Amino acid sequence: MPVLHNRISNDALKAKMLVESEPRTTISFYKYFHIADPKATRDALYQLFTALNVFGRVYLAHEGINAQISVPASNVETFRAQLYAFDPALEGLRLNIALDDDGKSFWVLRMKVRDRIVADGIDDPHFDASNVGEYLQAAEVNAMLDDPDALFIDMRNHYEYEVGHFENALEIPADTFREQLPKAVEMMQAHKDKKIVMYCTGGIRCEKASAWMKHNGFNKVWHIEGGIIEYARKAREQGLPVRFIGKNFVFDERMGERISDEIIAHCHQCGAPCDSHTNCKNDGCHLLFIQCPVCAEKYKGCCSEICCEESALPPEEQRRRRAGRENGNKIFNKSRGRLNTTLGIPDPTE
């Protein structure tokens, strides 16, 4: 019976990945299609991916698959061929290749079955997720950006929007995708006559969001094919102006892909221009926040003097202080001025 899960420590796997000499390619993909038996599909894909030395994060549900992975460069074409052959629904699937990639995005393969591949909070039995808005490609995106009758809606979380977004795009302030969906409907009620263009990192969230908007009576809805990643790639290939400003936040060790030279965010500690996310080095905190190099040195990678002091304590004392605290890491939410519990590197399905 093959082993269908990882049995090596994270530290050992990360150390092994960091000394790998073979280049890797970071890839993301998704597909909404019916999977009759997600558990069996998960186990079969786990064996396929493991044989090709694929790392990353993969979610499966009855509604489809969502993956962010790292593949050895020498195995990319074999991976593509085997993925396409795995199920007719996956044949010809678009694979989003990372724009700014050092090959160190993942170091372990985690593959899970979930209720949804994106946690949307939708429980309306009449909702048709396949009734999506029209796709837009790079040139069409730029044309829409110049159309005064079009509104661009960013369907990413607040910390993603903070470091980069399309020109004049509207932020739907929320910590999770499930919070954004009803807010988007509410905020757009006065603009039902407008052309609504939705976008996200790789396309999975804005595709479902476009269907949700149509379900709620919005008729002129588009979404960007392949999200920010595919837009930027195609715009560059076609010699078009790239109209996304700043950095594209990604849900792996890189925490961002540089799209333009502009830095539109600021250090959460001193206010200097900066768009580099990090997690607080205090194991009892792990706050996700933006920190400039000066503050990183001053606070030793921590988010505050308190965390800096605590991280310098003996390990046993640190463990004692953490006992009984709320589990999970936090995200700095500048707009609300409070901390929010979530995963260390946020979960892209939330």
Swiss-Prot record:
Keywords in alphabetical order: Oxidoreductase, tRNA processing
Keyword Manganese attached: no
GO terms (BP aspect): tRNA modification
Positions of the catalytic residues: C200
Summary of the function given for this chain in its UniProt record: Catalyzes oxygen-dependent 5-hydroxyuridine (ho5U) modification at position 34 in tRNAs.
Family assignment from sequence similarity: Belongs to the TrhO family.
Listed name of the protein: tRNA uridine(34) hydroxylase
The species this protein was found in: Shigella sonnei (strain Ss046)
Gene, per the UniProt record: trhO
